[in-house]
Amino acid sequence: NAEGARAAELRASARRFLRGAVRMRLLMRDYRDGFFPALLTPIKEDFEALRLDAAPDVVFTHRRADRHQDHRLIAELTWQTFRRHLILEYEIAKYEGDLTTPSAYVELQPAQAQRKIDILLDCYHSQRSKQWFTADTFRALMRLRGVESGAASGWAEGFHAGKVLLG
């Protein structure tokens, strides 16, 4: 979902997160925030069009158990659409308190963790009023995941991976 300022935030963060990427294409829609379940048909049609147009190596989405209705629907549609792909469900520390123990971790170096924090804080101005949207929250979650995973650097991101093909 990206309309107005949120679309600008998405573009700015994608440019920074994906700097150096060989190719980048952003697809944004302007569905009403908080109403995704009521808009299932057009959203599912967009997912189907994306499936026909893209062949990603990995797909990142919200957790299927996310308590935010929009996030949960997007996760469900991701699994319905990209059945033969590696899907990593990411975490968001927020009001709903729905964090659990991830099943996959990616070690980060301290500079990478700080870069992520900087990009989030610099690019997502619309989220700054939220109590959970702080450098301390982001830093704490990455440190906790670093401890859980035993990452040598002490920093990691956690993901939920429901299906992983090794080899």
Describe each PLM feature range.
Residues 159-160:
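Short, solvent-exposed loop/turn segments enriched in Ser/Thr/Gly
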